[in-house]
C-alpha cells in the first residue's frame, strides 16, 4: 500500500494498484518513480495507450499484444519491443500497466 494525497491506496505485493479507480495522472509519476522511471511524453503515450486498451478489452496487454496494438496505432517506429524496452527497461507490459494503475498482465511472470 502507499499513501498519496492524504489517503491510503491499496497495492499488491508487487506494487500494482488493487483498484484501478484509485489511479490518477497525478499518481502516475509516483508509481513511475518506484520503477526508477521519470515520465516523459513518450512514456505518457504508452501509459495512456494501455489504459485505453484496458478500457476497451478489459485486460492489460501482455508484451506481444502491446507491441502489435502499438504498431497498429502508431506504426512500426513505436510498435516494436526495442522502442518499448528503452522506455520501460524492466518489461514494457509490466511497468506500463503498473504505472497506468492497471492489473498485471496475465501472461507476465
Curated annotation (Swiss-Prot):
Alphabetic keyword roster: Cytoplasm, Transferase, tRNA processing
InterPro entries listed in its UniProt record: DsrC-like_C, DsrC-like_dom_sf, DsrC-like_N, DsrC/TusE
Superkingdom of source: Bacteria
Molecular function via GO: sulfur carrier activity; transferase activity
Keyword Transmembrane: no
Compartment(s) of residence: Cytoplasm
Top-level EC class as recorded in UniProt: transferase
GO biological process assignments: tRNA wobble position uridine thiolation
GO cellular component: cytoplasm
Similarity comment: Belongs to the DsrC/TusE family.
Subunit field text: Interacts with the TusBCD complex. Interacts with MnmA.
Protein name stated in the entry: Sulfurtransferase TusE
